[in-house]
Amino acid sequence: MDTVIDRDLHAASAQPWDLLVVGGGIYGAALALEAARRGLAALLLERGDFGGETTWNSLRIVHGGLRYLQSLDLARHRESVGERGWLLRHFPDLVEPLPCLMPLYSPPRGGRLRRPAVLRAALMVDALLSRDRTLPRSRVLGVEETAKLFPAVDREGLRGGALWHDAVVPDAHRLVVELLRWACRAGARALNYVEAAELRVEGGQVRGLRAVDRELGRSFELKAKAVASCAGPWVRRVARRFDRDVPGLFRPLLAFNVLLDREPLAPGAVAVASRQPDAQTYFLLPWKGKVLAGTAYAPITEELFHGRIPGEPLVEGFLRDLNAALPGFEARREQVLRVLWGRLPAAVEGSATPAPRPVIHDHGREGGPRGLVSVSGVKLTTARSIAEKVLGVFASSGALRLADRPAEVERPAPDPPLPLDELTRLAEEDWGAARDHLRGLVQRQSVLRLEDLLLRRTDWGIDPVRAESAARLCESLGWRASRARPAAAGGMG
């Protein structure tokens, strides 16, 4: 646990950088790691907390690209399988195999995709193209075996089930932090609550940017050869600020998942859809002893929102869809613990269909500042492979020179928090030891706010009921709420 995410603004502004990464979600963290491994001095800036927006609100499934076989996109299937394997190998403490079961029905329910013959062929192709996979082989099950694994399955017209394995990252927020710890070990730095305010350009070439510490409101300058914007839903806004609007970068749609206070339906994820031929498929998977269901999509409109969550009509409609897909499930609004929502890129303006492919926009090639690249990703799985492509764009434009091969930098030993029950017990037995554990976590992982601690360094605050007791425990152990504090204090008195 020797690797620290050190929020040292003075040190960051004192040296020149090869690459500034704007955005601290999964895409920014992966790019910071790959840049550092390729010999670049990389600094990541996140205007909020690491992994606090789209990444935190995701369904947490690491897909292997089975759906790409429907369109015969073999290259993307292979990429997804490879990246899923990379995550499983390098983060076995955070990424685990996930059995996925899709019930299969007689036509017309579910269209061609849910017919046994079609799924059997797709799974066979998937196996042939994934010979180096480490997950169990996929197979088509009979009716009784399907019902045994998924007792709540709708048996009307049931002809069996397709069973395959993907992966899941239950603590996606910790995956971001562990990527950043690895990047820091490789020589990068990462600063949260720092906003990229203004690009510095000389002679058409990126020279750095002006940044703002959002904790204290102070500006400082950063010198760099190149800037990559991985700002997620804000990538288009950053493009306007640094260059000009690029509509194709990000056309927003609403995406949300719902955490239900229900017992898990099966050991892994189940894929369900209503009896309408073109009904959307939803996944329901176990998460923290509850059921996480999604993903639902809707066009972005003002009337969708009441405050910061999707409006009640959308949530109620989603629950109706789930209940139609699973007669007898009877999910109710009062069982909703959290609505995890965010913005994803849409295929076209005003659409409820997600964009099918990521976008990498080299501003210099379009008459903008040379050394500025914007990235809009579409799935968690391929964040690292997209990072490699972004570095390739910088290299081909001459903005950056990369080492021929990534350096063999060993990932730091994981730095997990204690489970909340264990910390509570430790506080009762040895208050000082519990306080030291909390203080160390806060200082090593750049925790500035209590929300960051409860939701993005730990899972203590995911259940709203437990969140209150977790907050009281942290305050009893010395957490203080002052925002205007030195980074070294880390919120611990």
Predicted regions and their residues:
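Extreme N-terminal leader/targeting segments of oxidoreductases
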Residues: 1-19, 34-38
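Dinucleotide-binding Rossmann-like beta1-alpha1 core, especially the glycine-rich loop
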Residues: 60-149, 282
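Helix-loop-beta segment of a Rossmann-like dinucleotide-binding subdomain
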Residues: 129, 147-186, 208-210, 296-306, ...
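C-terminal catalytic lobe of FAD-dependent flavoproteins
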Residues: 174, 182, 245-254, 259-292, ...
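A conserved short coil-to-beta-strand element within the FAD-binding core of flavoproteins
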Residues: 192-207
